[in-house]
Amino acid sequence: MGNNRPMPTLVLSCEHAVCSVPEWYRERFKDSQDVLTSHLGWDPGALNLGQAFAMKFHTPLTHGEITRLLIDLDLAPDNPRRFSDFVAGLSGDQLARMQERHLGAYLETLRQRITSGIHVSPPVVHLSVHTFSPESGLVPPATDIVILSQGGRPNEVLLSGAWVAALRNAAPDLAI
């Protein structure tokens, strides 16, 4: 008998994959390399982890191509915090172009992959890969893995709970 449900489509993303700065914005970071290369500028290791998941599950990885200190791809297009202080002084047109070129293109790629997944093999599971540093204060210092879910989404909470249970069973020494 068994479970006849189709395998869900996995959509992988990594918003804070790099700390790259396009040539035309480099002057803004000339005295801020430490900030740019810190966890404030990107999620070190997240791109490698996302690529490993993509290879393991034979699915593409959608990832950011610029530092979150220019525009944070993890924030909504209307969130005023999506732009950092490093873009202060740019005109509205410049900010709109940056948003369209980076955030808009990124979100459109994700939408296309999710829509395609819904048509091919629903349901779709979207996994966004991040890393946290102890300095961020976002996780307890001795934490190895964090699985986040949005409380208002019951299926997401169930999947996250099952994943945590499976990880604890497979690797009881990890702090999850």
Specify the residue positions occupied by each region the protein language model found.
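N-terminal catalytic or cofactor-binding beta/alpha core of small enzyme domains
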Residues: 1-176
